[in-house]
Amino acid sequence: MSQNNKIVNSWNEWDPLKHVIVGRADGTCIPAPEPALDAKVPEDSDMRGTYGPRTKDTVDKANELLDNFSNLLEKKGIKVDRPTPLDFNQPTSTPDWKAETMFGCMPPRDVLLTVGNEILEATMSYRCRWFEYLCYRPLLKDYYNKDPNMRHESAPKPRLTDADYRKDYLSDKIGVTKRLEWTESKYFVTTEEEPLFDAADILRFGKDLVIQHGFTTNLKGIDWIKRHFKDHRVHAVNFPGDPYPIHIDATFTPIKEGLVINNPQRRLPKEQRKLFEDNGWEIIDAAQPAHNTPPPLCYSSVWLSMNVLVLDPKTVCVEKSEKYQAEQLDKLGMEVIPVELRDAYAFGGGLHCCTADVYREGTLKDYFPKQ
C-alpha cells in the first residue's frame, strides 16, 4: 500500500479493504427539531420532542463496541483511523438558520464518499450536520499531505433555508399510507432548491455510481455528482416501499461482483433492475431481520441487519445478533465475521454506516458494459 505513497484508493464496495475510518460516539446528541429531521422521525417514535446529549452510559457502551470493531479490523491487517469529535452539544448557525445542537461523528459513511483517489465531502441535508465534516478534516489533511495523488474535494455547502424543505411533510397527521404514495411519486421532504446529497445514498460499482433519490439526496444533488464525476455513469434509483427513504445501505447492498441483496420491503423497481439483469448481476431478497423493533432512541429501521461491511469478495462483517442475515451470506459462500454493534445503532447506524473506505485494493473496472 505504501507503493508511490498511495493512501486513498477505493472504486467499489467489495474489493479487499486495507484502510478505513471508524466513527466515534463521543458527545453524540439527539438533534433538536428541524425541517429535514421532523420528516424522518416516525410519528410514534420515542425520539419525538427529545433532544440533547445522549447519556454517558449509552455513549460509553457504543464507544466500547466501536473500539472493539476497530481492534477486530486491525487484527485482520486493516489500518483504522478515527475522527476527532467536536463539542456537539452547542448551538450552531449561519446567516440563514440556527440549530440548537449538532449530531455526532459515529457514521463517517454519511459524510465521506471515496471514489478512486478522491474523498468527497457531501453537502449533507440536515442543519445539525452542517459542520460534521470538521471531524474528518485532520485525517483528510493528513492523507492529502502524504499522498501526492489524493484529491480532497468538498461539494458546495448548501444554505439549507426553509425553501429546501416541504412544510407539508412535517404534519403528525400524515399516515404511512400517504407517505408511501409520496415516496412512490418521488415527492420527498427536500425540494430542488439547491444540490443536496448524503454520501451514504451512493454506492460505487466501478465506472457506475448508483444513487438513491430520497429524503437526503435530491435530483440536483445527483446532477451535481454526475457533472463532478464526469468519467462515471450515474444512475438514480428509488425504492417505493420505504416511507422514510434515507441512505441506500439498509436497502440495497452489493456483496461482491455480480451479487446484490435487496430489502424485500423496498424492492428496486422493475425498470431500474434492467441495468443489473442485462449485465448478469443477481439481485436477491435480503434475509429477514432478527429484531422486530429498532433499539431505543434510534432513527434507523430494523433493516440495519443488511448494513454489512464487506472486507473482501469472500468475507463480510455482520452484526452479531443478525443470525438470519449471517446464515444467508454463509449459504452464499461468504465467510461471516459476527460483530457486536446493536447498542451503537442509535448513534448513526450499522457496520457500513460507521465506516468509510480510505483504501481498497483493485482498479477502476466496468461492471455494466451493456447499457
Q: Which role does the model predict for each range below?
A:
Residues 1-371:
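The feature marks the mature, well-folded catalytic cores of soluble enzymes
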